[in-house]
């Protein structure tokens, strides 16, 4: 059976049935859509919109009409740019943009002041998008598998950040700004080009540090409460006086419900391991979160 394809301006035939559930959500994942049907933007009460793995190439400016939208999944598509209208969604808390072709984010992206969880892994970002620095409420930032070489000195402005995933980038030195991110719980620098680390004791809230697949000869100096993943980690943790902490999940799983803050740092398989979706990601179960 082939993937259903809708005409550009019409809602799929089953959309009305979905909306009648009263949950104000629309699942379009896995369909063949080059652009979002214009009728979707007329659903002014919509709160959850899933458009993953559809081949989507563009979004209309009219997406800003979805003023009640809280969750927007656009991952595994072919988006090269985002419209300014997407930046005018005042209630948006979760945005999934992984696996697209994005080189940058719009300057107005900083208007998304309700955003708490952003996945933008698997794109073509060479520089850290500066609009993100103004998202002080953002708690979970997934930027793995991009092309970053450095982080801005102003990164500590993101005082709400608790989980930062930077695996699969091109860092050759540990970014100095990270040493001033004292509220981070999870830091993932797998698969970079790091040859060493500074003393990481300044990261007092750190609970998980992953540095696997880097050209380092041993683990960094960290507090005994930090779970390490990488060369020499098992030996280092075995030397501790206290029992080795139970490892919290390192990679965030997809979660589409409006959980509390602690559930934004949930664990499980990252989206890069899932491949293009054939349907909804909502079937994935959320693991227990890491509290603040």
UniProtKB/Swiss-Prot annotation:
Compositional bias segments (type: Acidic residues): 7-16
Keyword field contains Phosphoprotein: no
SUPFAM superfamilies, per the entry: L domain-like
Swiss-Prot/TrEMBL keywords: Leucine-rich repeat, Repeat
Positions of region (Disordered): 1-20, 236-261
Stretches forming LRR repeats: 22-43, 45-66, 68-90, 91-112, 114-136, 137-158, 160-181, 183-204, 205-226
Protein name: Leucine-rich repeat-containing protein 10B
Originating organism: Homo sapiens (Human)
Gene: LRRC10B
């Amino acid at each position: 059976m082939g993937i259903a394809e809708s005409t550009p301006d019409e809602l799929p035939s089953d959309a009305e049935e979905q909306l009648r559930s009263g949950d104000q959500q629309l699942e379009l994942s896995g369909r063949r859509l080059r652009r979002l049907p214009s009728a979707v933007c007329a659903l002014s009460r919509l709160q959850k919109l899933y458009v993953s793995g559809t081949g989507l190439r563009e979004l209309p400016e009219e997406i800003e009409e979805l003023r009640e939208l809280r969750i927007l999944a656009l991952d595994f598509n072919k988006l090269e740019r985002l419209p300014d209208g997407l930046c005018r969604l005042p209630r948006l808390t979760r945005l999934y943009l992984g696996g697209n072709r994005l080189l940058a984010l719009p300057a107005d992206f900083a208007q998304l002041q309700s955003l708490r969880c952003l996945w933008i892994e698997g794109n073509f970002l060479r520089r850290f998008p500066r609009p993100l620095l103004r998202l002080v409420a953002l708690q979970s930032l997934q930027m793995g598998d991009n092309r970053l070489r450095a982080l801005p000195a102003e990164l500590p402005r993101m005082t709400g950040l608790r989980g930062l995933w930077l695996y699969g980038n091109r860092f050759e030195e540990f970014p100095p700004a990270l040493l001033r991110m004292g509220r981070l719980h999870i830091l993932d620098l797998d698969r970079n080009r790091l040859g060493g680390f500074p003393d990481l004791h300044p990261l007092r809230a750190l609970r998980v540090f992953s540095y696997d697949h880097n050209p380092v000869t041993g683990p960094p100096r960290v507090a005994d409460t930090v779970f390490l993943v990488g060369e020499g980690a098992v030996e280092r943790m075995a030397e501790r006086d206290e029992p080795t902490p139970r490892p919290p999940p390192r990679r965030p799983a997809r979660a589409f419900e409006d959980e509390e803050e602690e559930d934004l740092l949930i664990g499980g398989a990252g989206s890069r391991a899932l491949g293009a979706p054939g349907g909804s990601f909502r079937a994935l179960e959320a693991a227990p979160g890491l509290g603040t």
